[in-house]
Amino acid sequence: MRKPSLLPIITEKTPGAAGGIQRAKQIQGGPAGILYGQSFHFVIKSPNKGTESTIQPRRLLPPLKEVSVVSRIGIVIKPNKPEALALAREMIGWLNQKNIRVYLDTAVAASIHHAPSCPQEEMSKCVDLLVVLGGDGTLLSAARHMEEEEVPILGVNLGGLGFLTEITLEELYPVLERVLEGKVETEKRMKLHAAVIRQGRTVGEYAVLNDAVISKSILARIIHLRSSVNGAYVTTYRGDGVIISTPTGSTAYSLAAGGPIVYPAMDSVLITPICPHTLTNRPLLIPDEATVEFTLETEESDVRLTLDGQVGCDLLPFDRVVIHKAQKHVSFIKSPFKDYFQILRTKLKWGER
């Protein structure tokens, strides 16, 4: 694996009452001016000669990883989308010419008469790379089934907004060429684990890439959710519900509810209230190692937990929803042609009048 070159150590001394602070930093260069794996090393020098203390370096952003050799590629497509089927046929021919073995999701393999196929929930055991043709919803569904974090996902946008499926049709084959040459990098995204506990028994467990949403299902009534972080009481949310999202999900429902945009490679958990009755309830960002718990204190039973907008379960009064960081990540292929901030500018139309 090619290692990023290290820039020279920069030493800077600032005068101070205690004899000054000498700072040295060694950084790894990254694309577009972003310093991946950047760390700072501080040496505090005392007026007494021969004594100093060191603050250990802290990584600000996780390093990107290069993709290893790819010989088996899986393709997952959005069902009943003709352009996705046509593109899959075209990709299979292109990849076969390069001696790449292609696996299709069993649910759609028969429709284009292709073999071999593999159930989506087992795809991570069959392939070195998963290509998703569709929108963010298709990618979210595929990511939930990826058991092995070593298998990266390349999302190709055939849908609408496409925050997760960041590769365009025009970029698809140039990116695939780079993948086969080992010249692209992956970025790990954290997932959440959500559990529903009813009368002391776990009745449901879920993997979450974007967000977990606790909300009223039908009737327009205020629901009460008692919240705690690591066992410490935070507040009781009164409103339409609450969104618990990953940094990846911060540009989804949470953003529409007034939450901030969180850089997707960060490890943190975002809690965003939905239409809170108490106007001082604001979004809350907590560390990724924290466990957050919500207890439904509403007597009505028309409240639902929804995961990534696709699966979920009905909640009963006094059910507890416990959420923490999942053990495994999801790896995405990074676009070599644009960075995250270019994607934000394009998708959110920043600067347009």
Where are these regions (language model features)?
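Extreme N-terminal basic, low-complexity initiation segments
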Residues: 1-14, 21-22, 26, 36
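Aromatic (phenylalanine/tyrosine) cluster motif
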Residues: 36, 40-42
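Short, Lys/Arg-enriched N-terminal segments with co-localized hydrophobic residues
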Residues: 41, 49-69
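ATP/NTP phosphate-donor binding region
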Residues: 61-129, 170-185, 196-206
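Short glycine/serine/threonine-rich phosphate/pyrophosphate-binding segments
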Residues: 84, 137-142, 251-256
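Catalytic core of DAGKc-family lipid kinases
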Residues: 161-240
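ATP/nucleoside-binding phosphotransfer catalytic cores, i.e., glycine-rich phosphate-binding loops
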Residues: 214, 230-233, 279-353
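Gly/Ser/Thr-rich active-site loops/lids in small-molecule metabolic enzymes
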Residues: 235-239, 244-280
